[in-house]
């Protein structure tokens, strides 16, 4: 059985003081989460503050991006070595905002996945289609191509250490959400693709998260789907009460 992962992507929000307040609120209401994993991904500037707060708690620490080199003359970049030094165990790679705003392509994203793995970080590889691509009937083709491009040449053992997040671009921050059935169908397609790349045993063990306007009022229906193994949460992770409701989704799969 795959252990659900509920991940909060804070994007470019929260000063260090605001981050402290949010984490304290999360810890106050967290309770028993032994049957699921909880992750927060603050901006780089808040990682140190959040690390000190979540050490020894069930909340894991992740980053929102990483560069492909361990060190060097790469002004403004953050290396996987630095993230590990700060206590990160996860890193988001290939988020649609990185693809669209910063021009990141599949080749660079694949290198970031490898860099994360090489330094014992679990990459959360984000894939997803735009609204025009979905309307044109190309959603599955686009998503499968993104998965294959990012994981090209990797061994089954490497692929087994990756988390996938399906985030339909048209649903991110818009209030629109893929229906649970549509999300489930895409997750099945992704899992089938992983099976072709790494074998069914590996594919069956990989967490595939849904991301795209995940909210307290839709998390239960999403998590009831057999191939949705958690959520990558944006706006709803910025307030303790809403993220806690998502973390405490019901019912647990079993």
From Swiss-Prot:
Query: Residues in the active site?
Result: 95 (electrophile), 167 (proton acceptor)
Q: Which UniProt keywords apply?
A: Cytoplasm, Gluconeogenesis, Glycolysis, Isomerase
Q: What CDD domains does its record include?
A: TIM (cd00311)
Q: Subunit info? A: Homodimer.
UniProt-listed HAMAP family: TIM_B
Stored SUPFAM superfamilies = Triosephosphate isomerase (TIM) (SSF51351)
So what EC number does this one have? 5.3.1.1
Protein name listed in UniProt: Triosephosphate isomerase
Q: Which InterPro entries match?
A: Aldolase_TIM, TIM_sf, TrioseP_Isoase_bac/euk, Triosephosphate_isomerase, Triosephosphate_isomerase_AS
Job of this protein: Involved in the gluconeogenesis. Catalyzes stereospecifically the conversion of dihydroxyacetone phosphate (DHAP) to D-glyceraldehyde-3-phosphate (G3P).
Q: Mind telling me which NCBIfam families this protein's record contains? A: tim (TIGR00419)
Q: Name one GO molecular function term.
A: triose-phosphate isomerase activity
């Amino acid at each position: 059985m795959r252990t659900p992962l509920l991940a909060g992507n804070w994007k470019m929000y929260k000063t260090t003081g605001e981050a402290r307040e949010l984490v304290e609120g999360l810890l106050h209401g967290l309770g028993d989460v032994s049957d699921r994993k909880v992750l927060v991904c603050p901006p780089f500037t808040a990682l140190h503050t959040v690390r000190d707060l979540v050490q020894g708690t069930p909340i894991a620490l992740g980053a929102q991006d990483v560069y492909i080199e361990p060190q060097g003359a790469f002004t403004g970049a953050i290396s996987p070595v630095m993230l590990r030094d700060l206590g990160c165990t996860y890193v988001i790679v290939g988020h649609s905002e990185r693809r669209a705003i910063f021009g990141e392509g599949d080749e660079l994203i694949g290198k970031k996945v490898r860099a994360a793995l090489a330094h014992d970080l679990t990459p959360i590889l984000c894939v997803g289609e735009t609204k025009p691509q979905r309307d044109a009937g190309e959603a599955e083709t686009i998503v499968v191509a993104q998965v294959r491009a990012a994981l090209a040449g990797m061994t089954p053992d490497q692929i087994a250490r990756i988390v996938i997040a399906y985030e339909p671009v048209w649903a991110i921050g818009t209030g629109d959400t893929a229906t649970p059935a549509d999300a489930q169908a895409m997750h099945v397609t992704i899992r089938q693709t992983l099976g072709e790349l790494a074998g069914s045993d590996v594919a069956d063990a990989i967490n595939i998260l849904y991301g795209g306007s995940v909210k307290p009022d839709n998390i239960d229906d999403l998590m009831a789907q057999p191939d949705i193994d958690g959520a990558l949460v944006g706006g709803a992770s910025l307030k303790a009460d809403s993220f806690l409701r998502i973390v405490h989704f019901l019912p647990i799969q079993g």
